[in-house]
Structures are given as structure tokens and as C-alpha cells.
Amino acid sequence: MTLRPSLLPLRLLLLLLLLLRGAVCQAEAGSETESPVRTLQVETLVEPPEPCAEPATFGDTLHIHYSGSLVDGRIFDTSLTRDPLVIELGQKQVIPGLEQSLLDMCVGEKRRVIIPSHLAYGKRGFPPSIPADAELHFDVELIALIRANYWQKLVKGILPLVGMAMVPALLGLIGYHLYRKASSPKISKNKLKEEKRNKSKKK
């Protein structure tokens, strides 16, 4: 059986379209699997050993063990070979994504965290261990938690506001002093000399 000459171009075109569609589908599937995460992802690996009455919140001091790795599995930092890391939540002592993942965590709990680059080191990276735009993976365990009391939280919350309020006041005082200095009448040198002469004559 032979194909009509008029049907050959049509069948070749259909075959090319099918091949092209398959290639596009494979490319889309590959891009979906390789695309970086856009939001913080938190997975609980180990639940706290007992009901958690005091989950971590801003102002608390946390003792954590962690291991940080890149997408390819290379570990760039770990605390497992040293003492736990001590941080105070809300003081920006670690990258934003890691700090956010520690909120509501309980002692004894272990989490796996996937942090997008904009919540880690962003475009600048942290050479040489962390490249630019790197997605980071952390395994974190909360070893101990020291609860901040009411007065500690109050002081830490008010002091920044007081500092912000004092800046305009100080600027206003400086501006007022400069204005008074500029608007005060200036005495010429000749007039000063005359006043000195008059004082000396009176003596």
C-alpha cells in the first residue's frame, strides 16, 4: 500500500506537531519541578513530647539546634557540632525566613523549613558558601525556651517608639537654636571696639 502524494505532507505535519507538543510538555514539567519556592514552607518532623502550653513568640529567647543546606543537599552550616544557637525572637538575629519558622514552636519540636531566597540572603548571597538567589533548607529543633516577662516585652516595645519620637524633638530644638542664632542682631567689630574704649575711659 502506498500513500497518496497529497497525504504525505499532511501526515508529516501531524507527526511534527505531536513531537513538538511532547517536547513542550516535558519542558513544562521540568520547569515545574525545578522552579524555586515562592513562600516559606514549614513541615513538622517531630511533634513536641507533651501538650505545648507556651509556644515561642516574639521576645522569647530560644536555644536551637539547626542544619542548613542548599537545594543540592550540601550543608553550609550546622550547630550540631557545637552548643545550640541562642537567639531572641524579633531581634532579627537570623534570616527572616528562619525567624518566622520558629514562631509557635514548642520545646522538643523539630521542623523542616524551606526558605525562598527573598527571605534568606537574596541576590547578594553569602559567599562563598551560599550563592545568590539560593533557596535554603533547614532542619531545626527547639532545645529550650526562656519566656520574656511582661516588663521586658513592654520595655523592648516602648524604647524604639521613644527613640523615634525623640528624633523630631531634637531636630526641632537644633533648628530653633540655629534660628535664634541667625536672627539675633550682629554687632560689628568697630562697635565692639568703641564699647571697649568707652569702658576703659570710664575706668
UniProtKB/Swiss-Prot annotation:
One of its GO terms (biological process) is chaperone-mediated protein folding. GO terms for molecular function: peptidyl-prolyl cis-trans isomerase activity. Residues 59-146 form the PPIase FKBP-type domain. SUPFAM superfamilies: FKBP-like. It is a single-pass membrane protein. It comes from the Eukaryota. It catalyses: [protein]-peptidylproline (omega=180) = [protein]-peptidylproline (omega=0). The chain crosses the membrane at residues 158-178. It is an enzyme of class 5 (isomerase). Residues 1-29 form the signal peptide. Gene3D superfamilies: 3.10.50.40. Keywords: Isomerase, Membrane, Rotamase, Signal, Transmembrane, Transmembrane helix. GO terms for cellular component: endoplasmic reticulum; membrane. Its main location: membrane. It is found in: Membrane. InterPro entries: FKBP2/11 (IPR044609), PPIase_dom_sf (IPR046357), PPIase_FKBP_dom (IPR001179). Its EC number is 5.2.1.8. The keyword ATP-binding does not apply. PPIases accelerate the folding of proteins during protein synthesis. Belongs to the FKBP-type PPIase family. Interacts with IFITM5. This is Peptidyl-prolyl cis-trans isomerase FKBP11. It comes from Bos taurus.
